């Protein structure tokens, strides 16, 4: 038969300890529940211009939202190659990504115009276009495609490397098997040079160069340095044939659910990330040639660019029909 003796009453000290423990438990739970974790992915290493972009962005988001949002950063295509990552953001399976503009025309065709060869005079010109009315209007074109484009950033001017021969004039490119991005404008232009184009995800490029699957590739100095392409490429020519922007992208439905103040915090964080990203590109461009030469690459930095432009005259005529001569001239003449 169970005892009917009353249980001892807890002391006031025990009650206070219990209350404190419950308070801490519920407090920690509330804090954990209040913090939303998101992910952002890049295709390059952390120690790169893209790494600077997303590391800065993650820090700024947490700071500007009082820690209510935490952005986890992933490098070396840990969450997928650029095209896969962009598609994942569009579908909502990933929250954020930072991508070069290479695969973007497959999702937002209006951005193709930015990939026309020799469209921009220099980085100052490109940045002025992207930060001005033309670039900001292009950002709005992402809204209807499942994205919120938070800010333009930078990959840089693209240059050609290969393991076969020094490229001093356009004819030297003929017959080279080159990895290209999955970008229709790039592919059309490189075919105009007589290049055998091989579209390939960035994560596969080093091995393809190492094994001789392709002869060469083209990328900005920042990418060539961080990817250590000097280990598998002998010749580099500073062609500067295409300017490659980059973008902070967020799933549109997710962005729309944020309070207005938080939306602005994400935009401002992306802009700060872009600012430091561009500074890193400037740094890499300033020291990159000397670094790569010291590592054994032959670097040609004095080509007659007008000859390369002339070699693409038939292709550029097609681009004028595709995009409109007036639209191209508007970009070329922007200050």
Swiss-Prot record:
Main location: periplasm
Binding site for (R)-pantoate: 50, 82, 155-158, 179, 219
Gene Ontology molecular function: any one: carbohydrate binding
InterPro entries attached to this UniProt entry: DctP_fam, TRAP_DctP, TRAP_DctP_sf
Domain of life assignment: Bacteria
Signal peptide interval: 1-34
Any Gene Ontology CC annotation: outer membrane-bounded periplasmic space
UniProt keyword annotations, A-Z: Periplasm, Signal, Transport
Keyword Transport assigned: yes
Function comment: Solute-binding protein that binds (R)-pantoate and D-erythronate (in vitro). Probably part of a tripartite ATP-independent periplasmic (TRAP) transport system that mediates solute transport into the cytoplasm.
Matches recorded under PANTHER family: 2,3-DIKETO-L-GULONATE-BINDING PERIPLASMIC PROTEIN YIAO (PTHR33376:SF18), PTHR33376
Subunit structure: The complex is comprised of an extracytoplasmic solute-binding protein and a heteromeric permease formed by two transmembrane proteins.
Family: Belongs to the bacterial solute-binding protein 7 family.
Protein name as it appears in the record: Solute-binding protein Veis_3954
């Amino acid at each position: 038969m169970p005892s009917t003796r009353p249980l001892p009453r807890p002391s006031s000290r025990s009650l206070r300890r219990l209350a404190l423990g419950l308070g801490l438990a519920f407090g920690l739970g509330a804090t954990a529940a209040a913090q939303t974790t998101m992910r952002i992915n890049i295709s390059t290493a952390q120690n790169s211009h893209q790494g600077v972009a997303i590391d800065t962005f993650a820090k700024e988001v947490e700071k500007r939202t009082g820690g209510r949002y935490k952005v986890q950063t992933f490098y070396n295509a840990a969450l997928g190659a650029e095209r896969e990552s962009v598609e994942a953001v569009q579908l909502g399976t990933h929250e954020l990504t930072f991508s070069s503009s290479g695969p973007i025309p497959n999702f937002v065709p209006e951005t193709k115009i930015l990939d026309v060869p020799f469209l921009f005079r220099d980085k100052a010109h490109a940045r002025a276009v992207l930060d001005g009315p033309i670039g900001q209007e292009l950002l709005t074109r992402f809204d209807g495609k499942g994205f919120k484009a938070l800010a333009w950033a930078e990959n840089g001017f693209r240059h050609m490397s290969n393991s076969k021969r020094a490229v001093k004039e356009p004819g030297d490119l003929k017959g080279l098997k080159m990895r290209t991005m999955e970008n229709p404008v790039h592919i059309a232009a490189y075919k105009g040079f007589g290049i055998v184009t091989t579209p390939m995800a960035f994560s596969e490029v080093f091995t393809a160069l190492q094994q001789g699957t392709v002869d060469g590739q083209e990328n900005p100095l920042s990418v060539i340095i961080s990817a250590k392409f000097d280990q598998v490429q002998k010749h580099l020519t500073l062609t500067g044939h295409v300017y490659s922007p980059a973008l902070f992208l967020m799933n549109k439905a997710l962005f729309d659910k944020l309070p207005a103040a938080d939306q602005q915090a994400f935009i401002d964080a992306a802009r700060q990330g872009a600012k430091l990203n561009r500074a890193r590109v400037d740094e890499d461009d300033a020291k990159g040639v000397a670094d790569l030469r010291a590592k054994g690459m032959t670097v040609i930095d004095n080509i007659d660019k007008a000859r390369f432009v002339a070699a693409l005259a038939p292709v550029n005529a097609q681009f004028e029909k595709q995009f409109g001569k007036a639209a191209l001239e508007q970009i070329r003449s922007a200050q």
